[in-house]
Curated annotation (Swiss-Prot):
<dbReference type="InterPro" id="IPR002220">
    <property type="entry name" value="DapA-like"/>
</dbReference>
<dbReference type="GO" id="GO:0009089">
    <property type="term" value="P:lysine biosynthetic process via diaminopimelate"/>
</dbReference>
<dbReference type="InterPro" id="IPR005263">
    <property type="entry name" value="DapA"/>
</dbReference>
<feature type="site" description="Part of a proton relay during catalysis">
    <location>
        <position position="45"/>
    </location>
</feature>
<feature type="active site" description="Schiff-base intermediate with substrate">
    <location>
        <position position="164"/>
    </location>
</feature>
<dbReference type="Pfam" id="PF00701">
    <property type="entry name" value="DHDPS"/>
</dbReference>
<dbReference type="InterPro" id="IPR020625">
    <property type="entry name" value="Schiff_base-form_aldolases_AS"/>
</dbReference>
<dbReference type="GO" id="GO:0008840">
    <property type="term" value="F:4-hydroxy-tetrahydrodipicolinate synthase activity"/>
</dbReference>
<comment type="pathway">
    <text>Amino-acid biosynthesis; L-lysine biosynthesis via DAP pathway; (S)-tetrahydrodipicolinate from L-aspartate: step 3/4.</text>
</comment>
<keyword id="KW-0456">Lyase</keyword>
<protein>
    <recommendedName>
        <fullName>4-hydroxy-tetrahydrodipicolinate synthase</fullName>
        <ecNumber>4.3.3.7</ecNumber>
    </recommendedName>
</protein>
<keyword id="KW-0457">Lysine biosynthesis</keyword>
<comment type="similarity">
    <text>Belongs to the DapA family.</text>
</comment>
<keyword id="KW-0704">Schiff base</keyword>
<dbReference type="InterPro" id="IPR013785">
    <property type="entry name" value="Aldolase_TIM"/>
</dbReference>
<keyword id="KW-0963">Cytoplasm</keyword>
<comment type="subunit">
    <text>Homotetramer; dimer of dimers.</text>
</comment>
Length: 294
């Protein structure tokens, strides 16, 4: 089982006239490949998966697999739901489509117990043969996958190999690695990409990489090679843009930034998401000018 790691990008999903813009999506993925990104992650939080139909969700995975075919860039497909049977359907589709791994967010809104989370992930992972990465983002889902549950899943289920940690807590990442040194901990918070890698993390799933894939690739590859001074320097350099890209709920700012930078032709969201406020749009524009991406 090849464990997907390194510099990974949580892809945005571009729309045109209310529909998936397939050409723009393929173009964005190719840009990631061209900038040495190790894996693209379609239809996660940043990809507005919550407002996509299942047909659109699956089409995004297909496009990612098609564009990445024959390259060194892997596809880690989003396959999360608060209904286990839906998550299994998405995961099985991703495997059949040719995805290299699954990223599955914890069930949201219905707030399962830790035993419920265990049974959910066990059923999902056992329904496929490809690697599965847990995804913990309690600020969005309303439920925290506790370290004990993560360790239990890692011990009991062969293809669960790690977790995307988006709690923003370095302490949590250190705890997980102290308890299970072989667990792959992946940063889910761009602000602390370097600290997580320096403490034994195996990569990042980055929002900022949509805009600056070269910088994120350099940061991660330097860190994984033990070149911590270089990794820290890049992480520090990206502080202001990381902050600006989270001035409102993700993916509102990153999508606006991609539009301002000319990387997508239309700025469209699906309700209940809207364009950034005028104040935040100005902040994003000012920050992009500083980083010379406009």
């Amino acid at each position: 089982m090849e464990k997907v790691k390194g510099a990974m990008t949580a892809l945005i999903t571009p729309f045109r006239n209310g529909k998936l813009d397939e050409e723009a999506y393929a173009r964005l993925i190719q840009r990631q490949i061209d900038n040495a990104i190790d894996a693209v992650v379609p239809v996660g939080t940043t990809g507005e998966s919550a407002t996509l139909s299942h047909a659109e969700h699956k089409r995004c995975i297909e496009i990612a697999v098609e564009v990445c075919k024959g390259t060194s860039t892997k596809v880690m497909a989003g396959a999360g739901s608060n209904a286990t049977h839906e998550a299994i359907d998405l995961a099985q589709f991703a495997q059949k489509a040719g995805a290299d791994a699954i990223l599955s967010v914890s069930p949201y809104y219905n707030k399962p117990t830790q035993e419920g989370l265990y049974q959910h992930y066990k059923a999902l992972a056992e329904s496929v043969d490809i690697p599965v990465l847990l995804y913990n983002v309690p600020g969005r889902t309303g439920v925290d996958i506790k370290p004990e549950t993560v360790c239990r899943l890692f011990d009991d289920v062969n293809n669960i190999y790690g977790i995307k940690e988006a709690t923003g807590s370095i302490e949590r990442c250190v705890e997980l690695l102290a308890k299970r040194p072989e667990l792959y901990v992946i940063s889910g918070d761009d602000a602390i990409n370097y600290p997580i890698i320096a403490n034994g993390g195996m990569g990042v799933i980055s929002v900022t990489a949509n805009l600056l894939p070269d910088k994120i690739s350099m940061l991660v590859h330097a860190g994984l090679a033990g070149q911590f001074d270089t990794a820290k320097m890049i992480n520090d350099e990206l502080f202001d843009i990381n902050k600006a890209l989270f001035c409102e709920s993700n993916p509102i700012p990153i999508k606006a930034a991609m539009y301002i930078a000319g990387l997508i032709d239309t700025l469209e969201y699906r309700l209940p998401l809207l364009e950034p406020s005028k104040e935040h749009m100005q902040l994003i524009e000012k920050t992009l000018a500083k980083y010379e991406v406009v």
